[in-house]
Amino acid sequence: DNTTEFAKSICPLSNLKNIIEAECELHDVGKLREKFQTDMLDVLRLGDDAHKGGIDHSTAGGRLMRELMGENEFSDLLSLLIYSHHGLNDCISLDNGKTLNEIRDDNDIEYELVKSRLFELYGEDYIKELLAKAKEDFDRIDMQVKKYVKDHKKGYGSRYFFMGMYFRLLLSMLIDSDW
């Protein structure tokens, strides 16, 4: 996948490469939806007269991530990266108080079809192994950040600050690579 290879090539930190590969491989999984495929065929057939855009193609990747990895900080980070690759989302709706995950879980995205098509293309074992490697790297980074914050006490930022910087870097590389 071009997005994956480009993102890995511009990554300045080798310990992020597995996380980058996981986010890139899953960010457009929703394009396997029947509705998305039909929309793309209409664009080819009708050109400028076709309906363009507006079809959710990021929810499936984030939802799959959370299903396979469970609810934890890693799955929260990676699903938010995937959900946000075309613009940041509020994590809590001010309208109804629902979390981003609850909102995304309510979306009708042909999830089971997308999941079966993805596993048919890549293999379920490959996806699970990819996520396991990314989780190992996340855990290693998190331990390093915790140690750094503990060793340096005040004045150098909190764990949330440093993990937020990793998030920003990961999101930037995904966005820069997805063109």
Predicted features and spans:
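Accessory nucleic-acid engagement/destabilization modules that flank
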Residues: 1-179
